[in-house]
Curated annotation (Swiss-Prot):
InterPro entries: CCZ1/INTU/HSP4_longin_1, CCZ1/INTU/HSP4_longin_3, CCZ1/INTU_longin_2, INTU, PDZ, PDZ_sf. PANTHER family: PROTEIN INTURNED (PTHR21082:SF4). GO terms for biological process: cilium assembly; establishment of planar polarity; limb development; nervous system development; regulation of smoothened signaling pathway; vesicle-mediated transport. Residues 104-118 have a biased composition (Basic residues). Plays a key role in ciliogenesis and embryonic development. Regulator of cilia formation by controlling the organization of the apical actin cytoskeleton and the positioning of the basal bodies at the apical cell surface, which in turn is essential for the normal orientation of elongating ciliary microtubules. Plays a key role in definition of cell polarity via its role in ciliogenesis but not via conversion extension. Has an indirect effect on hedgehog signaling. Residues 88-144, 688-738 are annotated as: Disordered. Residues 165-253 form the PDZ domain. One of its GO terms (cellular component) is cell surface. It comes from Danio rerio (Zebrafish). This is Protein inturned. Keywords: Cell projection, Cilium biogenesis/degradation, Cytoplasm, Cytoskeleton, Developmental protein. Its main location: cytoplasm. Pfam families: Intu_longin_1, Intu_longin_2, Intu_longin_3.
Amino acid sequence: MFSTCSDGRPFQSFSTNLEDFDSIRSVLLYSDLEPEWLDDVQKNGQLFYLELSDGEEEALLAQVSANHSAATNHVRFSEKEAEIITDNAKRQANSSNKSEAKLKKLTKILRRKRRPSQRKAEGKDSSQRPASILKNQAGQRPGVVVQQQRLKDVCVYLNPKRLSSVSSSSADRGGLLEALLGVVHRPGGNTGKRGGKLIIHGLIPHSPASKCAEILIGDALVAVDDVEVTSENIERVLSCIPGPMQVRLTLETVCPAGVSPESKVSASPQVSQLVRLLWGEDTIELQMSIADVPHIAMFLSLRLDSETQQDEQEIVYQYPQSEASAQLKAVRGIFLTLCDMLENVTGGQIISSSLWLQQQLVHVGYWKEESNLLVIAVPASRVPLLYLQTVIEGVVRTLKVMYGSLDRGFSDVENAPRLDHFFCLFFQQLIQPSRLIHSSRTPDLYGSLFLDGLPAVRWLTLPPDIKVEVDTVLSDFESSDFGDMSEDFYGMRRLYVILGSCLFYKGYLIANHLPKEDLLDVCLYCQHYCLLPLASEQRVAQLVVWREVFPQRRETRNSTAHPGYCQPHARHFLLIVGLRHFMQCVLLEAGGCASSAVGRPTPDSVYVDQVKATLLQLESLDAGIEERLSAPPTPCLSCADWFLPAGGRSQQDTIGSSPILNRLTAAIKPPSPGGIGRSLFGEAGTVGIRGRRASPQRSQSDSGSEGHADGTPASVARRDSLGSGGSDGSLGSAGFLKMPRLKHPNPFYLGSLRKSLSERETEEMQNVLQVTAGVENTLFHYVLMESVQGIFIAPTHTEIRHLSGSIHPQLIHNFQHCCLSIRQAFQQSLPTRDRRGPERQSTAGLGPVKEHGVLFQCKPQNWTDQKKPAPTMTYWVIGRMLLEPVPQEFYVCFHDSVAEVPVEMAFRLSFGLAV
């Protein structure tokens, strides 16, 4: 079966391989292998399992190896007990017999805290983790008498559960040393004597040892996780590994002169702090790093028992326990007075307040629900007051999705560790997001606040052929007509009904088969647990998340909205499976058409395996999606630095690597390279959409003679439009539309040189979408939100990075900051709706704000010419809200040289958008 791609080349339909992937589904369905995540299922049925890929594992193991010194212990085995003997203990035993070697039961010895592992369960107690004989006791000295400079530590990931796939003959021949570790040891000569050294004579292909470049043939295995091993006890030591875990091997080798074993380890990259935090590690360290920052989350009860007066009896939950939070907790009486007594007296609704604490301004947000009050305080330097309520609403909705209600979530004592983990992630994202997001540049505060606060998910447009294949694969999975998921298989009801699913790639939503409200519930959970940036930055070998959820669309259902129909009384579960950069979220329903769920159901391996098979089926589309991410931006974007005169830009700007520009310059033979820039773009130094810089001649107003003296961007005019015919400000749209059009060369206008291009090249050039009208492209940035579908489109991170310069990053920052204020004005202009009650009549006489804009002036900060003033570039940031026929919000940033109609831009962006 063949079809045609968007560029005209033949494309073999992916449907031809469906039978092959059906066989994969069958293999996974009827496989007897035990899932690796089975041991991490908690008592309440929830599961949070994260396993890194091979590359991330090597970085993690290298870090673990670097953080531990070479220290080994001796172990003496008996039938039911094991004795750990250190050199210090042996010396004491030889000197006197006053102290005997202390014997511990195997279960107590095995109780240890696992090192950073690829398998972690959310909120699981360390005492419930698999035990291990490989214990590193604090205060023990090295116990292997060898030269320190000849020792090296390497870490490998061992999984005893995979032994079932190893043939019995190989396991019997080499034992666990070959079957589990992959090391071939052939006793002979002096090494074959009882208790001799374990010399590595070979490595089994595809084994854990062969994947580690530090393990070489000829090395001697001295210790396994600080336990001295010989040919006599190696099988006993390896048999004590209870489950999948990292094991540190101490090897004796001959190092070349001048090369230390730690040289390669120190150069290994560090594991993302986000991964360690998701595993439940480093929470104390991260919390201590912001202990001096005033912040707190408290759940207070307004129902106080006057008979039994107790200290802090109104505090149901508090996080964190620090000195700064203690000062906020001490003034909780003010919070109770504002939100309870004052509200009862005035009848108003208190949503936020501000106070000074330790020379810092702190914003406090409130959410009152029945007789309970949720209080969240954050520093004003991290969260603006106009965005605080959006943050509170996001937290409340996420907690309701997870626990059904705030009272149910905070009142249950068992949820306290999970809530601590939740708020640890929450405050880390607000106060120090750079610790979680591994990036070369500091995350933009206002950019993340604005985009994360939108009631929508970031959408990535795909070519039609790839989009069709993705939707087809998801529809095949959601049909549930295979194996145990079919009613005809056993003649009984299936366990769950798949209500829908959504698919992410590197944090971008590429397919959605969920209703809007369910999509927002799922994405809020993924956003608060940082699952979207996790899949974007790292290749995940396996991610499995399972928990019961309470979709808000069903919790707040209204029977009058759909007469004659009511939602079934069912329970809902969220299944998230990640594989490499793909992540699929599935919403399941138990009850109604499916069997009723009893107790606390655990994840069913059949459903997990089928989602994995779906992601494996989509893996072949990886190259096409990456090509879309690396393609030039559509619509075309301009860099703000291109609109500065030549003196305001770096003199090192040269002709870039634009495909059309390269073909154009190859077709035309100019007299000199400098002539190319002057003939095409009027000035030397021009670059294409991803690197080409234009130098249009600006008018006197852009030359900087009448600009501001400071080097920071300044807002010089504000543009408002009330209703359909509201009047503008002093420099509003009236003066804006009458502004004379500035004539200067367009870096995207080829003119008569178009004739030198071939017919196909001309067609490709015409396919480039330009949103702005006229011959020039003056669009710098945009965000379009489709409220009905719950998505928004914006330039990708790659597209933003390509448009770098001295002014453009500051322009993007101003755009995000300004959009926060514009959207707040939009929300305040809408008819006021009490979030906890019925709709109330609006008091605004002129109707809702439909358009709002701010005019900025920007100057380069690296201006060194003292004789001439710095050039000034002016641009607009305009927001447009459309209520009819389809609710939309459109934010755009463009140069002031052209009078654009934002609604026309929004129409061009959304026209033909298939979701």
